[in-house]
Amino acid sequence: MRSVPVIAGDGRQSPPSLSRLRLLVFAALFSGLSACGLLPAEIDQTADWSAARLYTEAKSAFDDNNWEEALKYYQKLESRYPYGRYAQQAQMEAAYARWKDGDEAAALADCDRFIRLHPNHPSVDYMYYLKGLITFNGDLGYMGYLSSQDQSERDPRSAQESFDALRELVTRFPQSKYAPDAQARMNYLVNMLSAHEVHVARYYLKRGAYLAAINRGQYAIKTYPNTPALEEASYILVLAYDKLDMPELRDDALRVMRLNFPDSRYYTQGLEPKKPWWNFF
């Protein structure tokens, strides 16, 4: 508990007690010794380890999913042996470990740094792939049906970032072993981005913002052709033009829709809730 200074009769504070002076002297002395390095420091057991041993310990922790421990060794390896194959391998694995440890921003920064420093590395394609995985907010639909969340309602920024990274991978390295999975994820992401635009168009339609609904629907049709959400986008155009009392544009939109979707359920069911496009069961 902090002591309260005693006020003398003339209004002056009384001098601090002797015990308090001793504490202040000891604290100052301890700080001085620490600053001069006279006190024993904690011994780093890894101080004389080779790059190979540091990497072996890091990889062992990595394989056990002990991301924090792995990162500790990777950081020591990079700081002591910044050049060579061990350092480069550590940089790649550290990016993955940071992602799995929950630090997506640092993981993305690691990927960008590696790509910038080692553009001709034989495994640089993996770093583009990892960038796509870090920002990929989906599961290719394999287990998505277990969740009731509508993917189209999610913030599309990370999906767009993931798509851009994966597209760069398949463009730069079409023969990469990661390219097939990257392409499958890109297909999923395009469908999700399209569904998001249609979700926004439906939102505007329900709230009477018909021109905004038309703009969103048209954008989805032009930007994401051949995606499942375009059927609904086409129907939204028909409804919005009808609400705006534009019969010619409505009939033209309906004609195009009947040409592309002759058996659409929207003709009889309207905009009723339906299963998400990724929900197969």
Q: What annotation goes with each model-predicted range?
A:
Residues 3-25:
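Bacterial N-terminal signal peptides that target proteins for export
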Residues 4-6, 32-281:
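Acidic, polar-rich low-complexity tracts and alpha-helical solenoid repeat scaffolds
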Residues 24-34:
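Bacterial N-terminal signal peptides
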